[in-house]
Each structure stands twice: as structure tokens, then as C-alpha cells.
């Protein structure tokens, strides 16, 4: 409807990577060029992902919320360290590789599922590349989503894959399971994630 009401429109520019919120068929039929801007926010998303990883593992949002409501719940908020844990990437492009470099410096072990990534790139990043996405969920207590939304990745994160996560780090310490998604929403089945949070399959998301 918006495209039909813009007869002089010649270009739609997306400030980001995903274009699933643009009617590509309608744009094509109207002769309108659609472009995205890959790389424009890479570092910002890298830092946001690291922030979410730290916040979830250290219960920072809960601590902030409790303190603002007048509660002092220090003893109830026992966080764990990222060091010694495995992080699994779903998609290992520019953003995931940037997150991986920081995670590696912290002391995390890197794993990834990306069927389109050359093995040598994963090797250069000291990341174990898996052919089966389920292996990443089985091995990792921290999952970071950095892939495009497609028919292949729609609801890739669901009750079945979440139930595979171990909850125990590579260092043998109980740390719970943590999910960070800085990609398109449709990759995650939100109802399954909510249920996983309620039954504590997931510690945070």
C-alpha cells in the first residue's frame, strides 16, 4: 500500500541488513530498487551482543530492577563467569566474528553453525565449525544468533533445540543456559522461548 501510494519513489534504502520488512515483490513490480547497508552497524551490534552476554550472566537487569524497587537481593543474584564457557554462534559472519574475538579474549571457547562459511575462516578465528546446528546447542551454554532470516532459519531456535543445551559450562560449573539474538525476530520461536524461561530451561534471553 505504501509503495502504491508513492508513484515517484525510485529507491528504498534499509539502514541495516534484513529486508524482510519490505515488500520486495511490490517494489520489483514498481521498478523500485531496494538496497541494504551491510557493515554499517557491525561494531555497534558486536558491542551490544557482548553487553547482553555480560548482563544475562551477571543478572544485571534483575539487579537494576530490584534496586529501583527498593529491594536488596545481592545474595539471590549469584552470577557466573563467561570465561571457561562455550559460546555457540548461529551464523558466523562479520558480527559473529567480532563477538568471537571479544569472547575469545574473555576466555570463552568458540563454536559455530554456518553452512555457507569456508572452513578456513572459522579456523583463522579459532572457532570450531559444526555441520549440524544441533551439535552447537548440545555443547554450548551461551548461544548468539547472527544469521539472516530465511525459510531455512525460520524458528531455528525452538523448544527442541533449546532443550539440548547443557546448562553446565566446559569448566564443569553450573551456569544455566543463555540466549542472545541480535538478528531478525523470526529466527526464534518466541512462544517456545517464553516456555523455556518459565520452566528454567533458559536462564535468560
Range-by-range predicted roles:
Residues 1-35, 138, 158:
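An N-terminal-biased, well-structured beta-alpha scaffold segment characteristic
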Residues 6-11, 29-33, 107-108, 167-177, ...:
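A short helix->loop->beta-strand "cap" motif at the edges of active sites that frequently abuts
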Residues 9, 83-86, 159, 175-176:
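Phosphate-coordination loops involved in phosphoryl transfer and adenosine-cofactor binding
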Residues 30, 38-86, 101, 105:
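Phosphate-binding beta-alpha-beta segment of Rossmann-like dinucleotide-binding domains, i.e.
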Residues 92-93:
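Glycine-rich Rossmann-fold phosphate-binding loop(s) that bind the pyrophosphate
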Residues 96-97:
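N-terminal Rossmann-fold NAD(P) dinucleotide-binding loop
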Residues 110-112:
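Short beta-strand "acidic-cap" motif of Rossmann-like dinucleotide-binding folds
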Residues 117-205:
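Rossmann-like adenosine-cofactor binding region
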Amino acid at each position: 500500500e505504501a509503495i502504491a501510494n508513492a508513484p515517484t519513489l525510485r529507491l528504498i534504502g534499509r539502514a541495516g541488513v534484513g529486508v524482510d520488512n519490505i515488500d520486495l515483490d511490490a517494489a520489483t513490480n514498481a521498478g523500485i530498487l531496494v538496497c541494504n547497508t551491510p557493515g554499517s552497524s557491525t561494531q555497534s551490534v558486536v558491542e551490544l551482543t557482548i553487553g547482553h552476554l555480560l548482563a544475562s550472566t551477571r543478572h544485571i537487569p534483575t539487579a537494576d530492577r530490584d534496586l529501583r524497587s527498593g529491594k536488596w537481593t545481592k545474595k539471590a543474584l549469584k552470577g557466573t563467569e563467561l570465561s571457561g564457557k562455550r559460546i555457540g554462534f548461529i551464523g558466523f559472519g562479520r558480527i559473529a566474528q567480532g563477538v568471537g574475538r571479544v569472547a575469545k579474549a574473555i576466555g570463552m571457547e568458540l563454536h559455530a553453525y554456518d553452512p555457507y562459511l569456508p572452513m578456513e575462516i572459522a579456523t583463522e578465528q579459532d572457532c570450531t565449525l559444526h555441520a549440524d546446528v544441533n551439535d552447537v546447542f548440545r555443547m554450548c551454554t551461551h548461544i548468539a544468533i547472527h544469521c539472516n532470516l530465511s525459510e531455512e532459519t525460520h524458528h531455528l531456535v525452538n523448544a527442541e533445540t533449546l532443550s539440548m543445551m547443557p546448562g553446565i559450562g566446559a569448566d564443569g560449573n553450573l551456569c544455566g543456559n543463555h540466549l542472545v539474538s541480535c538478528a531478525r525476530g523470526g529466527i526464534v520461536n518466541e512462544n517456545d522461548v517464553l516456555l523455556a524461561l518459565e520452566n528454567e530451561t533458559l536462564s535468560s534471553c
